[in-house]
Amino acid sequence: MGIFRGPNIVRDGLTVLLDSRSSRSYPGTGTTWYDLSGNDNHGTLYNFTGPSAGSTSGFDTTTKLMMYDRHVGTSDGTANNYVRIPNSDSLDNCLITNGMSISFWFRQDVYRCTAMTKWNSSWEVYYCSSLVFRTQGTGGSDLNTGDTALSGFHNICVTSTSTGRKVYVNGVVQATGTNTVSTQNTTSNVSIGAYDGGAYAMEGSLPYYALYNRELTSDEVNQNYNALKSGFGI
């Protein structure tokens, strides 16, 4: 699938672009969520029960949002819905040691400690009262925003170079820190909405996900935020 020409978002370094509101990305049925970046990093939907109008566990045909419904009480996460992007050569360019950025739109409908996205042994973004950008591998550590209330849709963006990293919410820097990762694992899948396998799943909506193979500047983070915010009621 060729690159999508939509809103005026930053495209330099774009490695994954999933947007359930676009029929080119999710046609309204099936288990494939198509990558619009042109790199064929398509997502596979696991345990989603939609599509249907008002769905809380799949594609909502009314709002065009991808919905996630954590099944409370399942200890192993196998009933929870999540998205898996298989490892690829282009994803391997999104290591912390190379420089990378993730930008996604997120709405939590019920408070849960949740993994928004994770690349096992490489990086993770999760929310449990505060936003945490975790780097993994040799020298990995957590960058924590402190108490951060998230109600309604928010744009979360994390950026990293080989030496530093930042967390943004709606275009505003919430935390900065150093980065000392020296080696990372590059064989795992990228997951959205939970760990790969369904643990620490979210309950709400994450309909837009973009991954870059470089650090976005603050101006670029704001360009993406401003290009998309009206579509999320901001």
Task: Give the residues covered by each predicted segment.
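Extracytoplasmic low-complexity segments
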Residues: 1-79, 221-234
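Extracellular glycan-interaction patches encoded by glycine-rich segments
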Residues: 1-2, 89-90, 136-144, 186-207, ...
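Beta-strand-rich interaction surfaces with strong enrichment in secreted/lumenal proteins
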Residues: 91-93, 143-148, 179-180
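Short, aromatic/His-centered strand-loop micro-motif at the edge of beta-sheets
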Residues: 132-155
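Short, solvent-exposed beta-strand-to-loop segments that form ligand-recognition rims
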Residues: 170-190
